[in-house]
C-alpha cells in the first residue's frame, strides 16, 4: 500500500522555520503514418472552427476548449452513470522528470501536448503512438531563471501550425504534420532581466499572443502579438509604466504612472505585472482579456513608498486584439504587497444575476476572492472570499477592497493568508452551465512574510530568499511558524450566490486543474497521484485511477471514431512540487487516456522512497550559521530544508548519499547536474561558501535525527 507523505506542516512554513539556445540545434523527430491526417486536421483550425466546435465540442482545439476557456465539454457519452467503467486506452511516456502543466489539445484524433523544457509531442490518439517530437534544445543550466519549475502550459493550433512559447523566450511555429520549425521570434529582444515563458500562446484573429513571466526577477510585464502566418510582430502592450523621464508608449501608461511613487524608482526593478497565463477572447465584443501579475519587487512600500494603486498590477485588462489598444481594466488587488497575481485562469460566461442575463468574467485569483465582472465594461458586480483571508475583510459596492491595515505592516513578521502560492494558482478551473457551478482547485500554503528594509536591486545576500539566483522580492520568508494550516480542496462554487455548493478535501495543496462535462461529471487530478471523477451536482466520488505521480495539469476530452476519451498529462512539479510531494510514486511525465471499457495495462509506477538521513559528512560546526544563510539565498526553493522536506522532482539534500555532499563542489561548479537544470555557481559562491553549505546540510540532518 502506498504511503502518503504528511504535509500537515506546509512546505514553505517548514522551509523558513529552519532557517532556470539556438535555432540550429532544435530537432523534430517525425514518424510516417498519421502525419498527413495531422496536417489536414490542423489546417482547418481557425476562428470559425473554434467557435463552431464550441457548440458541440467533439474536439479540444484550444487549451481551454473554447475562446471563453470554460473547459466545459458538451459530450455526454461518458457520464455520471457509466464513468465507473472507464479504463485505460493507452499511455504515452513524455520522457520528462520535471513538472508537466499542459492541457492536451486534440483535433480529429491528433493530440498536441507540451512537456517540461518546452518539448512538444504529437500523438495519434487512436493508438497512443508518437507522430513526432520537437525539442527546442533549451540550455538546461538556465532552469534557475524561473521561480517555478521548467514547465510549459500548452500549445496553440492555427491553420496547419502548432505554436509553443519556449522557456528561453522564443515563440516557435511548427508544421503540424512534421514538427519542423516554420519560424521563430525572440520575444525577449531588447528586454532586461531573467525572463522565461511558461504559458501557452493564444491565437485570436490570426495573431499569436504570448506573454512572459519573471516578476520575482526584476522585470517589466508585457504581451506581444505576432502574425500567425509570418511571425511578424504586430503589437506589444506593457502592463506597467517605464521610466517616467522618458516618453510613455501610450495613454494607458501615462495614466498608470500617476498611481506609482517615483521616489521608489520602480522602473529600475521593472515594476512587474508579467502576464504569464490567462487570456480569453470575446469575438462579439472584439475584446481580449488578460490577467496581470505581481509587483516587482513584491513589497509595496519599497516599490512605491508613498502608496498608490500601482496600475496595472494584479488586474484584469481588456484590449483590442487587432491593435493591442487598452480598453478598460479592473484591479483586483490595488497596491499588491503579497505576490497576489491576477494571472490565474479566467472564464467568460453568460449567466443570470437578479433575473437579468449578464456577460461576465468569472475569476478566482491568488488573493482568495471570487470575482464576477461585467465583461462589456469591466464594472464590478460582486466578490466573495472562497478561502480564509487576512488582508481584506471584503469589497465595497464600488469594487474596492476593504483592507486590513495590519496586513500591510511589513515591519514585523506577518502571516500572509493566502500566501504567495495563492488561494488559487495557475491550475485551471471550469464552468458547467448545466449546474451553474465553477469547479475550482483551492488551497492554502502557509507563509510568513516581512519587508526587507535593506533590499537593493540585484544585490544577493545571505538569508535573502533565492537572491543568489536572481530573486528581487524585498521580502523575508520568516523563521516564525505561520499560524494558518495548509490545505488543498476542490470547490464547487456558485458565482451567482457567491458560495460553495460542495467541496472535497485533498491530502495536500497543489492539485490539478478541472474539466467538467454535459455528462454531469467533473474530473480532477490530485497531488497524491490520482485522476478522480466526481458528480458535478453533488461532489460524490464516482471513479478514480492511479497516475504514477502527482497531477497538476487539467484533463481534456474529445470524440474519436464515435467514442469519447479523457486524457490527462501528468508530471509532478511547479514551484510547490520542486521540493515537496504528496506521494512516493514519482513516475515520469505521462499522458494517460481513458475510455469506457478500456483494457490497456497501466505502466509500472516508480516508488521514490525516502532514503536514510545523511550522515558521516565531516564539517565545522562554526560554519552552520553561515551555511544556513547561504542555503536560503541559493538553494532552498529547489531542494527544500535538508531532511525536513522529502524532495519533489528535485532531490532533498538531507537524504542524499554522503559521497554527493562530500564532493559538493563537483556539483555546484559546472557539475553534471547542469543538464538537468542545476545552475552553475562559479563566480557566485566560493570554496569556503560550499564548506559552509555542507556544514548546514549535515548539521541540519544531525539536529533532526531521532535520538536512539
UniProtKB/Swiss-Prot annotation:
Optimum pH is 7.7. Keywords: Calcium, Disulfide bond, Heme, Iron, Metal-binding, Oxidoreductase, Periplasm, PQQ, Signal. It comes from the Bacteria. Pyrroloquinoline quinone binds at residues 101, 153, 198, 214-215, 274, 366, 425-426, 575. The active site is at residue 339. Its main location: periplasm. Its EC number is 1.1.9.1. Residues 1-31 form the signal peptide. Ca(2+) binds at residues 216, 294, 339. Residues 619-708 form the Cytochrome c domain. Induction: By ethanol and butanol. GO terms for molecular function: calcium ion binding; electron transfer activity; heme binding; oxidoreductase activity, acting on CH-OH group of donors. It is found in: Periplasm. The keyword Signal applies. GO terms for cellular component: membrane; outer membrane-bounded periplasmic space. It is an enzyme of class 1 (oxidoreductase). Heme c binds at residues 635, 638-639, 678. Monomer. PANTHER family: QUINOPROTEIN ALCOHOL DEHYDROGENASE (CYTOCHROME C). Catalyzes the dye-linked oxidation of primary alcohols to the corresponding aldehydes and the (subsequent) oxidation of the aldehydes to carboxylic acids. Methanol is not a substrate. This is Quinohemoprotein alcohol dehydrogenase. The lineage of its organism: Bacteria, Pseudomonadati, Pseudomonadota, Betaproteobacteria, Burkholderiales. The gene is qheDH.
